[in-house]
């Protein structure tokens, strides 16, 4: 007996939508047997073979990860909108940008309704994360706040006041005024010329620990005229991780592992170290797609997890608000993106974690939806718009 929940869009079950069947998905969810975390790396991910067949389930199966399950066909009034997106991933797997997608998951009301894997996607393989690592760093800061290690008021505190080992007298002009919120919004004003960030400086001035922060504050140009101006850069994220390291007993890595991820059931991941010895804040983590979904659900629930406030709601609200205008329709919060979409004359808000190459956590509060995408391709903005529009079409009433 064939499980119809594993057909792709073009299979007979979708005939009433007027499509023709071309391909079938695999009935077996793809995974790597006996995978050890030491085997997970950016390079090993590049070496993963393509799936011989993609995997699609509109009624996902249970795994020991605590995720609640549902049925897309029962929860969506227009499932074909989402399935068209899945088909675009399948039809171009070896071709254009949409075809370099590795996974696509959709949840509504806290239930996983659609789970699909393509190309290099595996349910148990942590996918490399680029700038979406910044979004996780924000949540680590929020978790530290919930645990009482700092307060909302301290977001306006100059960063150097958190760091006891830096030498303020060596800072560039204006750098001592940069606050934690400035860094979180990418508006610190820091501008580091390439000729100053060279090997000679690194050899002369060790970057371990707060030495990294010292270097950033020293070698930046004067920030008087640039402070408050948005510029997307890794220096700001590194400073935020430095603050987490300084205020949390045991440091940032322990906080992320024991206080942020472990309670969410995220125990199989990679988070690389920076030059400072701290966890990288700009990029460098690797998470499974289902674990990314948990992160999105946490944000959708205003920081609540399993009935308890896990991250302060007011912090989540501010972190995912449109605090800074960037380009086009997009705004920026605390390492989280904010964008709106108009469908059938109505505007829907979206909060997003984004990573270069195509890692996305899409949160649509108006329709109680979280979606996850992983991929290996840059310039997926157009595809992201199509996915958000499809999700809204599928679940709006």
Residue ranges and their predicted role:
Residues 110, 128-155, 183, 240-244, ...:
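Active-site SXXK
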Residues 236-243, 283-305, 359-375:
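Active-site-proximal alpha-helical segments within enzyme catalytic domains
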Residues 22-122, 147-151, 397:
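N-terminal leader/targeting segments and the immediately adjacent pre-domain N-terminus
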Residues 26-38, 353-397:
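Structured C-terminal helix/loop/strand segments within mature extracytoplasmic catalytic/sensor domains
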Residues 266-267, 317-370:
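Active-site Gly/Thr loop motif
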């Amino acid at each position: 007996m064939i499980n119809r929940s594993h057909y792709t869009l073009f299979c007979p079950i979708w005939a009433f939508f007027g499509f023709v069947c071309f391909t079938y998905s695999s009935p077996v969810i793809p995974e790597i047997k006996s995978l050890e975390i030491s085997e997970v790396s950016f390079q090993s991910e590049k070496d993963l073979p393509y799936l011989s067949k993609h995997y699609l389930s509109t009624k996902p199966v249970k795994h020991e990860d605590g995720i609640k399950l549902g049925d897309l066909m029962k929860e969506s009034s227009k499932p074909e909108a989402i399935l068209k997106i899945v088909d675009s991933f399948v039809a171009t797997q070896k071709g254009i940008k949409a075809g370099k997608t590795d996974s696509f998951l959709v949840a509504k009301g806290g239930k996983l309704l659609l789970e699909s894997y393509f190309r290099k996607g595996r349910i148990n393989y942590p996918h490399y994360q680029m700038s979406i690592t910044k979004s996780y760093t924000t949540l680590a800061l929020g978790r530290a706040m919930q645990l009482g290690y700092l307060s909302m008021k301290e977001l306006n505190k100059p960063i150097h006041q958190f760091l006891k080992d830096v030498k303020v007298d060596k800072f560039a002009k204006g750098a001592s005024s940069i606050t934690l919120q400035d860094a979180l919004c990418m508006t610190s004003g820091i501008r580091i010329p390439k000729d100053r960030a060279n090997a000679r400086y690194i050899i002369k001035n060790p970057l371990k620990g707060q030495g990294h922060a010292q270097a950033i504050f020293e070698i930046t140009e004067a920030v008087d005229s640039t402070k408050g101006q948005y510029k997307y850069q890794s220096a700001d994220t590194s400073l935020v991780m430095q603050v987490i390291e300084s205020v949390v007993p045991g440091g940032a890595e322990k906080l992320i592992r024991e206080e942020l991820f472990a309670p969410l059931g995220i125990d199989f991941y990679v988070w690389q170290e920076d030059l400072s010895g701290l966890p990288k804040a700009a990029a460098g983590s690797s998470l499974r797609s289902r674990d990314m979904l948990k992160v999105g659900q946490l944000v959708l629930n205003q920081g609540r997890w399993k009935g308890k406030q896990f991250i302060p709601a007011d912090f989540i609200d501010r972190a995912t608000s449109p605090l800074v205008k960037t380009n086009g329709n997009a705004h920026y919060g605390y390492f989280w993106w904010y964008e709106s979409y108009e469908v059938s004359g109505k505007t829907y808000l979206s909060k997003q974690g984004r990573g270069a190459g195509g890692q996305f956590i899409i949160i649509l509060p108006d329709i109680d939806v979280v979606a996850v995408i992983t991929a290996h391709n840059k310039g997926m903005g157009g595809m992201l718009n199509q996915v958000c529009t499809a999700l809204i079409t599928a679940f709006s009433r």
